[in-house]
A protein has these predicted regions:
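A charged, aromatic-enriched C-terminal amphipathic alpha-helix characteristic of glycosyltransferases
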Residues: 302-342
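Nucleotide-activated donor-binding/catalytic signature segment of Leloir-type glycosyltransferases, i.e.
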Residues: 216-234
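Short alpha-helical donor nucleotide-sugar binding micro-motif in glycosyltransferases
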Residues: 130, 230-231, 238-243, 324
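Donor nucleotide-sugar binding/catalytic pocket of nucleotide-sugar-dependent glycosyltransferases
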Residues: 124-170
Length: 352
C-alpha cells in the first residue's frame, strides 16, 4: 500500500505535527506500507502574517497535480489545513478522489489570539474543509466530543505514540541550576500560553527549551527564567530527562506529543485540565492537572519517574501507525475508495 500525506508542516519546522508524521512514516515502513509526503519543499513561500519566522507555501495547481500523479498513491490523507492541504483537497475534489483528513491544530484559536478574528469564523472554515473527507482523524476522546459538538462529522480515532528508544531517562543533562527544575518545551509563541507558567511562584528554576516569536519579549520580562533555545535529538532528550517536572501550559493543543516524550524520559507532567492532558495524564500517577497550574506543578514533584517511563513504554508509534493504516484500509474498496482504471506513472490511482 502506498499512502500520500499532504502537509504544510514540515522540516525544518520543529513541532508535534512534524514529529508525528515522520514517526508515522518510519513505523509504517516497518509494517510494509510506504508513505510519501506532499510538502512545501520546492514551492515559493512567504512569511506568515503575525509570525514572519514561519513560512507558508504558495503552491500552483499544475505542480500539485504533477507531484500527486508521480506518486500515484492508493490512498490520500491531508494532515493540515494550510495552502498545501487546500491544494491537495482541490485536486481530489476535481478528480472525485476520496481522501481522509486529520485535525491536529487549533487554528481558530491561534488566529483569534493573533488577529482578533472570532474562533467561530475559523471553525466554519474548517467544517467546510473537513466536510469533504471520508474520515476526520482525531487523537483523543475529548477532541472527538468537542468537534462533534461543533458540527464536525465522520470523526475517527488516530492516537499518538512516542519513540522510547530516543526519549529515555538514561543520560540527563548536567544542569547547574537550583532544584527543582520546572521545564517547558516547544514553540515560544503567544498561543502556547507559556507566560502562564513563567509567572508562577515556584521554588527552584524555570527553564524554557525552544524558540519562537515571543522569546525576546519573555526573556526581557522574566530575566530569572533560563531560556536555552531549540534542542533536537539526544540533546533534547537529555534536557527533558534532567527536569523534575515538565510543565505543559498550552490550552490550544489537540494532543501534545511532548507530554509523552517527557514521560518517556521519566519526567512527570503538570498541565491545565484541557484536551490533551485530560486524555494523556487523566488520573494516572504520572503528573497532575489543575486549573491552578502552580498547584499542579507542586503536586507533580516527586511522582515516580519509573511509573512515568513505564506508562510511555505502552504508547508505541507502531500501534499508532497500525491504527492510521487501518482507518484507510477500512475505506477500501467497500466504501468510498475504489480503484479506477486510469493508470498514472505505472500505478493505479484511487477514485471515489
Amino acid at each position: 500500500m502506498r499512502i500520500l500525506i499532504a502537509t504544510d508542516a514540515w522540516h525544518p519546522q520543529v513541532n508535534g505535527v512534524v514529529r508525528t508524521l515522520t514517526s508515522l512514516a518510519r513505523s509504517a515502513a516497518g509494517l510494509g506500507v510506504d508513505i510519501d509526503f506532499l510538502t512545501p519543499d520546492g514551492f515559493p513561500s512567504m512569511g506568515l502574517p503575525t509570525y514572519p519566522g514561519l513560512r507558508i507555501a504558495l503552491p500552483n495547481r499544475r505542480e500539485i497535480a504533477k507531484r500527486i500523479e508521480a506518486i500515484a498513491p492508493d490512498a490520500i490523507h491531508i494532515a493540515t489545513e494550510g495552502p498545501i492541504g487546500w491544494a491537495a483537497r482541490a485536486y481530489c475534489r476535481r478528480r472525485k478522489l476520496a481522501f481522509t483528513t486529520s485535525y491536529t491544530t487549533r487554528f481558530p484559536e491561534y488566529v483569534e489570539v493573533r488577529t482578533g478574528i472570532p474562533a467561530s469564523v475559523g471553525y466554519a472554515v474548517l467544517r467546510h474543509f473537513h466536510a469533504a473527507a471520508s474520515m476526520i482523524m482525531v487523537a483523543t476522546d475529548s477532541l472527538k466530543a468537542e468537534l462533534g459538538a461543533r458540527g464536525f462529522k465522520k470523526l475517527g480515532f488516530w492516537t499518538r505514540g512516542v519513540d522510547t528508544d530516543l526519549f529515555n531517562p538514561d543520560s540527563p543533562a548536567e544542569l547547574d541550576l537550583p532544584r527543582p527544575i520546572f521545564m517547558t518545551m516547544g514553540r515560544v509563541a503567544v498561543e502556547k500560553n507559556i507566560e502562564a507558567f513563567l509567572s508562577l511562584n515556584l521554588p527552584g528554576t524555570k527553564v524554557v527549551v525552544g524558540d519562537g516569536p515571543q522569546r525576546a519579549e519573555l526573556e526581557r520580562k522574566y530575566p530569572q527564567v533560563k531560556f536555552l533555545g531549540e534542542k533536537k535529538g539526544q540533546d533534547l532528550t537529555s534536557h527533558l530527562a534532567a527536569a523534575d517536572v515538565f510543565v505543559f501550559p498550552s490550552k490550544t493543543d489537540t494532543f501534545g506529543v511532548v507530554q509523552l516524550e517527557a514521560l518517556a524520559c521519566g519526567t512527570p507532567v503538570a498541565a491545565f485540565p484541557v484536551t490533551g492532558p485530560l486524555d494523556v495524564i487523566a488520573d494516572h500517577p504520572i503528573g497532575a492537572i489543575d486549573e491552578n497550574l502552580q498547584s499542579a506543578c507542586l503536586r507533580a514533584l516527586g511522582m515516580s519517574r519509573e511509573t512515568c517511563r513505564n506508562f510511555a513504554l505502552e504508547r508505541s508509534w507502531e500501534n499508532s501507525a497500525r491504527q492510521f493504516i487501518g482507518n484507510l484500509t477500512a475505506l477500501q474498496p467497500s466504501r468510498s475508495l475504489r480503484p479506477t482504471s486510469r493508470v498514472v506513472a505505472g500505478r493505479t490511482a484511487v477514485r471515489g
